[in-house]
Structure formats: C-alpha cells, structure tokens
C-alpha cells in the first residue's frame, strides 16, 4: 500500500490533518488508529454529562499508570488517554480553554518559533471553531468544532461561584478565551447544539471520511516507523489481534499524532531517541535524539468540596432512578442534565504578583464527586477543581520493551519543586476565601474536603500528597525548539531526519494556562497549512490583556476570613 501521507493517531490533531490534507483530491492519506470507532450510539462518549464513564474502562481509554511518584507518597497515579477515533477529545471533560495569550508569546520568544505567537495562532483557533453565540475577533463561526457558551439560569451555583470570585477581589471576565482570560466567568465547552460531545471525529472526520483519498484503519496498533537511512518511508502496524505486521509506505511524509505518551514511545521503538535507552532493548539506532520522551508536563489539581444547603446541586442526577428520564431527555431532545458537561463556570487568577499571567485555574462543578466518577459525596454538594498551571516539575516517558502493547514507564515528578508546594498552599487558602464570600452564603454548608481541621502548611501539603490528581493534560515530550533537548523544529519536523513530523500536544515547549484540547486542535490546523505549503493565515490584530504588574486583586474582599 502506498499513500502520500501516513498519519499515526486519529486524535485531536491527527483528525485535523486527515481532513485538511484530503481537501486536495490528489493527495492520498492513510489514517491509523489503535482504538476503535467513535460509536455514536454509545452514551458513554456522546452524552456530555457521562464524561466520567470512559475513564472507568479500557474501551476508550489507554488507562496508563505512572511509576510511583516520589513526591506524592509514592502513589501510582492515573494517566488516562483517549483510544478511538477522536483520541482524547472522545473522553475529555469538553472544556474549551485555549490558554493565555502570553503562553504562546512565551513560546515565540524561542529562536525559530517566532511565528507561534498568540496573534499568529489566533486565526487558527478561529478557523477550527463554530461558537454558538456567534463569531467575533476572538471566535470563529464556520469551523468544524462546535463550541457552546454557558447561558444564564442553568444552575444558580454557577453565577454564585463567579460572583464569589469577584467579591473576593478578582476580576470578572465575560470570555475566558477572549480579550481577558484573567478572572472568573462562564466556560466554553465542546458540545454541539444538539447536546452531543463535539470530538474531532464528529467535527472533522465526519466531513472527510467519505472522501476516496482518505483511508481509515481502526484497531491498528503502530509498531514502528520504517526508515531508509535518515528518511521515514513508511509504517508497520498490527491489526486487531494479529501478530503479523501490515506495512504501508509514504511517498511524502509520516505524520506522528499519537499524543504526549504514545508519540515518544513510537519514536523510541523506531530507533529515534536516547541512544543509551534504545541500546537497552537492542533497538537499532536511527538517530540519537535525547529529548524524546523528556520534558513531560501536566496539570495537577485538587477538589475542595462543600455541602450545599439548598437542593440545587446535581446530586439527584447520580441516583439510578432519575437517570432513565435524564437519558431520554438527552437522547430524544438533546436537552436537560445530560446535555452539559456541567463545567460551565471557572476562572484564572494570579496567586502572587510575581506571576506575569494567571498561574491558578478553577473549574466549578455543582456536585461533589471525583473527575472519574468515583467517591461521590452522598448529599447535595459542590466543588472547586483548582490547580497550578505552569509547574517547573518535569518528567519523562520511556519504553520498557519493544512490545507495542506494553505500557511505558511514565513519571511526572509531580510536586518536585518548592514553587509547586507554595502554589498549592496558596490555591487552597484563596479558594476558601472565595467560598466564604456572601454570594455563596445561602448555599455553602460545611467544608467536606479537605476539612476545616486542615490548616497548617504541613497539613495542606499532606492533603496534596494524598489527594491531588491529574487533570489529564500531559504534554511536552517531543518539544518544539532548537536546543539540545528539542525534538522537532517550528514546523514539526523531527531534527536530523527527513519525511517525519510530530503534530500533537507533545510538541508544546511549555504547558499552557488551561486545558489542552483547543490548542492541540489549533496546532493541527496551523501545521496542516505548513505541510501543504500554504501561506499562513493573516496575523490577527486583536488586543489582549496583559497585567503589567497590576495587583492580583482588583479590590478589597467583601469578606476577609482573617
């Protein structure tokens, strides 16, 4: 089999490339996906409110696990990644957050990455998006990804939580993806007008899969990339339960879009990576590239949970006897509790003035439950998901064998810097201040977690060690740049090789301030133009907020806990 391009991974970026490259009818593309189809009849992936279900099994989730994390009481921690058409956009929380403009401007400070500034990237965010309330300088109106904005009146807890943030002295913003990210406001979500998950399989592949120049293979586990000297010329994969590899050749390029965990694994199995690591497994060295699998980053978060005195939380929706009605409303009308992910309000703040842009993120949820659906509190409650955004901690992904089915060694080194501990202590204390503002007085009951007895630095630190969890945002393991630990250049081309690019969240040099899916899609759109040799979209002239040393709180708190 011969194709112009072979794309490995039908995830948030791979589906973008498959769709954009096959817009040219003379370009042939093979799209390989280790998982299965995105079954539209499966409520677990299609109903926004069911977002916890895919993380509880292995049909749609690689269900990776870390090595014992040395600064987290040696816990082995979850590292869920999407498996199936749509990749992690098939199982994520559907929060559409692009990050802060200064994240991208920071990338663009690196020599060779100048065209990755916010104003260079904003046109590609807009190209990907159709926002339900209409387009403007920051949002698109004709893109493949449906973005829904929270509407007033959905749940009184959302507006109360936003108002509490304002009463605590922080700004209010009407658009976390617009002019000003800093502050509290409604959260955009990748949900269709019909109340369905807007994965990249739905948004992109639905328009491309019938094209004769696109071939899609599911249940295709990539074994390795084939090289002729220093040029990538094809891919070998295993289909289903077969142990006999299937092979295809690429006339132009192999495009690796398997994500921050799988992309470095595939490179390492293919002979690209740290020479000493590859020698351990007798893998013939194609190119010594020590940065492959290094620079692993993530967002860590905690839940601060409170009893809700008014019966307005989602607790009744967790009771089995209410779920048939919820399911029917969603299935036949695309409405009701099932049609939202319920992350409809959130915010970004600076915990200290030393940070030039927000370093703490909030997701508000009108129920007290773990992200993966476990440990639901058996009463009306609500919670804040809160965590730091740009931890200096770095980890790695390294293969354990040549077997493509064996999970790699994953170590994030969570909380390995003093900055991490200071940020999380600040986050807990600031959150308590926010939760005790007048806007929440009629709803807020007792603090369920951590509990009011948890006060000292030592007690807060122990709570973090035992209870902080991943936000499922790994990135950085094939970082873009030109230093000795970089893996790809500013166009995603792997250093020292030909015919091979990496296009996914693994190329982010530094993690962004927010959820990763929107920016991963943007990377796919921007790289698609580079691969096709098209001129970049015109640079945006939209303005954006920069704090420039402004106080972190715009005004004095309505109520001071001290």
From Swiss-Prot:
GO terms for biological process: glycine betaine biosynthetic process from choline. FAD binds at residues 4-33. Its main location: membrane. This is Oxygen-dependent choline dehydrogenase. Involved in the biosynthesis of the osmoprotectant glycine betaine. Catalyzes the oxidation of choline to betaine aldehyde and betaine aldehyde to glycine betaine at the same rate. One of its GO terms (cellular component) is plasma membrane. It is found in: Cell membrane. It is a peripheral membrane protein. Keywords: Cell membrane, FAD, Flavoprotein, Membrane, NAD, Oxidoreductase. Gene3D superfamilies: FAD/NAD(P)-binding domain, Glucose Oxidase, domain 3.
């Amino acid at each position: 089999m011969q194709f112009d391009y072979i794309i490995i991974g039908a995830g948030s970026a791979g589906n973008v490339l498959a769709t954009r490259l096959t817009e040219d009818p003379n370009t042939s593309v093979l799209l390989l996906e280790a998982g299965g189809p995105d079954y539209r009849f499966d409520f677990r992936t299609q109903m926004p409110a069911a977002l916890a279900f895919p993380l509880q099994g292995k049909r749609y989730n690689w269900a990776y696990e870390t090595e014992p994390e040395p600064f987290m009481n040696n816990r082995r921690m979850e590292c869920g990644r999407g498996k199936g058409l749509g990749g992690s956009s098939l199982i994520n929380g559907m929060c559409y957050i692009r990050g802060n403009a200064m994240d991208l401007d920071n990338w663009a400070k690196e020599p060779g990455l100048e065209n990755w500034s916010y104003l260079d990237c904003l046109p590609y965010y807009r190209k990907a998006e159709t926002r339900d309330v209409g387009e403007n300088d920051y949002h698109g109106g004709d893109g493949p990804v449906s973005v829904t904005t929270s509407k007033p009146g959905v749940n009184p807890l959302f507006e109360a939580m936003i108002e509490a943030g304002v009463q605590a002295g922080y700004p209010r913003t009407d658009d976390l993806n617009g002019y000003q990210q800093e502050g509290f406001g409604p959260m955009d979500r990748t949900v269709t007008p019909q109340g369905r998950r807007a994965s990249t399989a739905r948004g992109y592949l639905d328009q491309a899969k019938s094209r004769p120049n696109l071939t899609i293979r599911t249940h295709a586990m990539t074994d390795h990339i084939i090289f002729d000297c220093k040029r990538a010329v094809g891919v070998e994969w295993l289909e289903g339960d077969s142990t006999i590899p299937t092979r295809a050749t690429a006339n132009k390029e192999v495009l690796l879009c398997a994500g921050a965990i799988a992309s470095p694994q595939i490179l390492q199995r293919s002979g690209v990576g740290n020479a000493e690591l590859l020698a351990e497994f007798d893998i013939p060295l194609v190119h010594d590239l020590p940065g492959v699998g290094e620079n692993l980053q993530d967002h860590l978060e905690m839940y601060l949970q409170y009893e809700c005195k008014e019966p307005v939380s989602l607790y009744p929706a967790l009771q089995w006897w209410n779920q048939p009605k919820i399911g029917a409303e969603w299935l036949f009308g695309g409405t009701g509790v099932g049609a939202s992910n319920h992350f409809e309000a959130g915010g970004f703040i600076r915990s200290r003035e030393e940070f030039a842009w927000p370093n703490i993120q909030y997701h508000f949820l009108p129920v007290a439950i773990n992200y993966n659906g476990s440990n639901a509190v058996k009463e009306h409650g609500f919670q804040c998901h809160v965590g730091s955004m740009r931890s200096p901690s770095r980890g790695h992904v390294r293969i354990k064998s040549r077997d493509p089915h064996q999970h790699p060694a994953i170590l994030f080194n969570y909380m390995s810097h003093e900055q991490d501990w200071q940020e999380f202590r600040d986050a807990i204390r600031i959150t308590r201040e926010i939760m005790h503002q007048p806007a929440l007085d009629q709803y807020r009951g007792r603090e369920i977690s951590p509990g009011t007895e948890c006060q000292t630095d030592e007690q807060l630190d122990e709570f973090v060690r035992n209870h902080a969890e991943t936000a499922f945002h790994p990135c950085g393991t094939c970082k873009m740049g030109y230093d000795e630990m970089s893996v790809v250049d500013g166009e995603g081309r792997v250093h020292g090789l030909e015919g091979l690019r990496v296009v996914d969240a693994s190329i982010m040099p530094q993690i962004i301030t927010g959820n990763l899916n929107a920016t991963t899609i943007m990377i796919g759109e921007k790289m698609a133009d580079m691969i096709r040799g098209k001129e970049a979209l015109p640079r945006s002239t939209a303005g954006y907020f920069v704090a420039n040393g402004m106080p972190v709180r715009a005004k004095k708190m309505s109520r001071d806990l001290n």
